[in-house]
Amino acid sequence: MLSILKKLFGTANDRTVKKLFSEITKINSLEPAIQKLSDEELKNKTVEFKEKLKNGATLDDIVYEAFAVVREAAKRVCGMRHFDVQLIGGLILHRGMITEMRTGEGKTLVATLPAYLNALTGKGVHVVTVNDYLARRDSAAMGKIYNFLGLSVGCIVGGMPDEVKRAAYNADITHATNNELGFDYLRDNMKYSLQERVLRPFNFAIIDEVDSILIDEARTPLVISGPVNDNAELYGKIDKIVRLLNASDFEKDEKLKTINLTETGITHIESLLSKENIIKPDTSLYDFENLTLVHYINQALRAHNMFTVNVDYLVREGKVMIIDEFTGRVMEGRRYSEGLHQALEAKENVKIQNENQTLASITFQNYFRNYPKLSGMTGTAMTEAPELKDIYNLDVVAVPTHNKVTRLDLDDEIYGSKKEKYDAILKLIRDCYDRGQPILVGTISIEKSEELSSVLNKENIPHKVLNAKFHEQEAFIIAQAGRFKAVTIATNMAGRGTDIMLGGNPEMLIEQLDKEHNYEAKIAEIKAQIAEEKKQVIEAGGLFVIGTERHESRRIDNQLRGRSGRQGDPGKTKFFLSLDDDLMRIFASDRISGVLRTLGLKDGEAIHHPMISRSLEKAQQKVEGHNYEMRKNLLRFDDVMNDQRKIIYEQRTEIIKSKDSHGFLNSTTEELAKKIVLTFMPVGSYREDWDIENLSVELHRVFSIKFDHNVVSKNDVTEEEITKTVIQMAHDIYKSKEEAYSSELMHNAVKYILLTTLDQVWKDHLYSLDHLRQGISLRAYGQKDPLSEYKREAFNLFEQMLNNLKELFIQTVYHFHIDLKNVQKEDVSLEYKKLQKNMCESREDPAFSKYNAGSSLETDLKPVVSRIDPKDRNPDDPTSWGRVSRNELCPCGSGKKYKYCHGANE
């Protein structure tokens, strides 16, 4: 019934596209008049549009004419005219939706339409890509159109200095990678003046390869971190011990990606630890004093048994580098958290870096939801449409191709073993190579690509390998994968964003020419050669894409297929599978093995059966559903932190903007003074119960006040009067500092202290949230909802953080002094970095940890004192306590608050 209704009325997507086609006629009707304009008149249209917007017009009022102007500009500048389907894609993007357009349909050109239109508001447009190469390429190519029309263009890539980035972000249209945007947002919110920030307020973003960024990378947060003091040596010792374990000592679940010691494993590892004098002979691994070792052991087990070199990570220049499982690219600057990266470094016998403490973090899910208007484009999004709608409120519209797709997608071939599968793949590659048909072979890991490469080398078949190890050559290799007799092996979707043109890409070959020797002649020669090869390739059947395994996601498989058959070109695709493949082995092996046994599959034979295809698709849907739930669950928890992050970042911005820092100082001084007095002189208590001695100690610790006991000796004195006296004494101390340093310098100093203290307590708060998050799932065993528990406890931690902020801030303000030796008397408007250099503290406190707020992950940040999990603290060893909050119970076990016990003299 449903299929009949769809035939009668069409799908919702069909109806949307039909409606959009009716709008395209309005743009096309303007084309003759726009064509008659001179270059100068065409450029002046930008000024005209801006004037209309200034006078109250909306973007929708000028959308058709603006699109017609961009189309004409592209034709004059680049020789490219937007097709009708590209105009439809532009309208979809402008309206804050995702457009699904097949590979080769010109998505880069499509983005110029909404980018130009929305840039007319002067608020900036971000065009987001997945790597630096694409950002540079697109800004250079499409920038010609924008510049012709009088708009400025910027490009953001890694490693740029802030002043260059600031100029690029202030341009009308900015091309940038998703990573740099996220990191710049975090870095901006760690800076000490608005002038140091590089980003403008969020406005409109167009995300290229939107599925890769919003779905594939959604589970990996961007993190800026600083090293903490840690026992790197212990990772090496534990690694050596874990290598001695037997397979029966642990059990792993590949579906759930977990690994745990068995009972025999615990006994075995306890004896090994005892021999190495890591634990005492008569103790258990799970005794209180040894509990910290469990973390190291678990991470070492994961490193050795759940992570594979050249699949999950690679080792380059003595460093362990993470490989993106979806793109096959190295994730520059990323490190696994919770000690896993250190465990991998120990496994690979490279230098073990210190563990890091999070200074700032955000997921792409929450970063991109900051934009008031968001859109995206990709070749594959319909399978993930429910998730994109649910999480980002983005509708997906599939746009028809300009030319009919003639690519032939052949049925999968399934073999009993990996060797049989590889033999069949090799036979097909040999056949295509002999006929000159170009082949692109997709693998799921570097290991598999190199394995296949070695097989082709033995068969003397020339080929190129494209994986994370050769990232710099990625675009060039993939662009030439359509040449006559070309054989290219690519990990997953490496090279995505670069079209494979039949016969080769002449522009990239021309770029490599020596411009001084016969340049024009060589260009003509290259173009002639490419044209000839294109004819040969078309005769051979176009690009043949071979998949060596099914991916967990159908979308990734569709992306691989989409590399062939661009713009109506001929081509073929085929997947080769075996029962040894991860997806088949983990999720579908039993069912499919039964079918194969029933059908009597013999060695070397392949099978094509609808039941197997359905089973495989169900397995993929199962994994997709599981991954979606993981991403959705991550978002639910991250939303809690995101709400708190927004509050902190807004407060930070307000502090920076503030021209009077005394308001918060005075109110907090009064609040703490009242609190301290009431602690030692409770309301309604007798005079003999007042603890004047500890009141004096606490007032000196917090305010640097030398409290006169004679004030209390008066018979008629009240708590209120003492509070007023304390507040006045605090104000007097502050005034004496103003007289010594000047009001303006003190204003800057107080602002700086407030910012650094806020950064410190926020950093500690992130650490606390991380620990809370790690164990919160166990609440389910107590019939409690982990998410509700997390929200409740995270709120309590946030309130505690704000209280700690007030106390640390006041304590620092009243104790600090400035070294004026290197400060010019006339220079009262010191920058924050100068203040940081010249400030001295009267005591050591983690609140004064210095780090470069603008540092990227690669920058060496000074070590910070971290908070230690309470269960890891030795009550008899204060050096093991780490950072202790003033209001926590003292780790020594006395039952008193830390500030009244071991922290009384700080």
From Swiss-Prot:
Its EC number is 7.4.2.8. CDD domains: DEXDc_SecA, SF2_C_secA. May bind 1 zinc ion per subunit. It catalyses: ATP + H2O + cellular proteinSide 1 = ADP + phosphate + cellular proteinSide 2. Gene3D superfamilies: Helical scaffold and wing domains of SecA, P-loop containing nucleotide triphosphate hydrolases, SecA, preprotein cross-linking domain. Zn(2+) binds at C890, C892, C901, H902. Keywords: ATP-binding, Cell inner membrane, Cell membrane, Cytoplasm, Membrane, Metal-binding, Nucleotide-binding, Protein transport, Translocase, Translocation, Transport, Zinc. Its cofactor is Zn(2+). Belongs to the SecA family. Part of the Sec protein translocase complex. Interacts with the SecYEG preprotein conducting channel. Has a central role in coupling the hydrolysis of ATP to the transfer of proteins into and across the cell membrane, serving both as a receptor for the preprotein-SecB complex and as an ATP-driven molecular motor driving the stepwise translocation of polypeptide chains across the membrane. This is Protein translocase subunit SecA. The gene is secA.
